[in-house]
Amino acid sequence: MQEFTKLTGVAAPMPLVNIDTDMIIPKQFLKTIQRSGLGKNLFDEMRYNPDGSEIPEFVLNQPAYRDAQIIVAGDNFGCGSSREHAPWALLDFGIRCVISTSFADIFYNNCFKNGILPIVMPPEVVEVLMEDARRGANARMTVDLEAQTVTTSDGQSFPFQVDSFRRHCLMNGLDDIGLTLEKAASIDGFERDLATLRPWV
């Protein structure tokens, strides 16, 4: 998993509330177990017309936001079904951070496991960040996980809180497999001791 320490990138404003996982990645794209390739179908029904042409009004189709790495979202982002394809699609598009007033619990947890930082902020702060994001390509926010701050393009800085264990995992690029491998020596030692103490097992 890619490390997350400090990110400076374009922030896309998505004020719509209750963006669910089916909106993030529709069900017809869930047949794959590959994490790559889903970015082209991120927000598919919001990005494309039935004939496959782009909907120009959708934020990620606008030139200023095509390379966005941050989303400033409306309340209750990631609600709906528990599909892990949702963070996969966001990450494959290039999104590394989502800021909202609240997230669905399962989506929130899945983000951390896939290298995305979900940040919960008070409504008044999210509104400031949303307005900054509306400045287009000039809205290059900085998300500093070590300092736990979000800084707008005009220098306003806002603190955020994140669980220390999740922060450690993101900053060191540790998913579940990586965490297990960190303990490989201890696991090997336990297995050797177990074989000596309980050879019949």
UniProtKB/Swiss-Prot annotation:
CDD domains associated with the record: IPMI_Swivel (cd01577)
Keyword DNA-binding assigned: no
Protein keywords: Amino-acid biosynthesis, Branched-chain amino acid biosynthesis, Leucine biosynthesis, Lyase
Reactions that this protein is recorded to catalyse: (2R,3S)-3-isopropylmalate = (2S)-2-isopropylmalate
Enzyme Commission identifier(s): 4.2.1.33
Molecular functions (GO terms): 3-isopropylmalate dehydratase activity
GO biological-process terms attached to the record: L-leucine biosynthetic process
SUPFAM superfamilies for this protein: LeuD/IlvD-like (SSF52016)
Metabolic or biological pathway: Amino-acid biosynthesis; L-leucine biosynthesis; L-leucine from 3-methyl-2-oxobutanoate: step 2/4
An annotated GO cellular component: 3-isopropylmalate dehydratase complex
Pfam families found in the cross-reference section: Aconitase_C
Gene3D superfamilies: Aconitase, domain 4
InterPro entries found in the cross-reference section: 3-IsopropMal_deHydase_ssu (IPR004431), Aconitase/3IPM_dehydase_swvl (IPR015928), AconitaseA/IPMdHydase_ssu_swvl (IPR000573), IPMI_Swivel (IPR033940), LeuD (IPR050075)
Task performed by this protein: Catalyzes the isomerization between 2-isopropylmalate and 3-isopropylmalate, via the formation of 2-isopropylmaleate.
Record family assignment: Belongs to the LeuD family. LeuD type 1 subfamily.
NCBIfam families per UniProt: leuD, PRK01641.1
The protein's assembly and partners: Heterodimer of LeuC and LeuD.
Record-given protein name: 3-isopropylmalate dehydratase small subunit
Gene encoding the protein: leuD
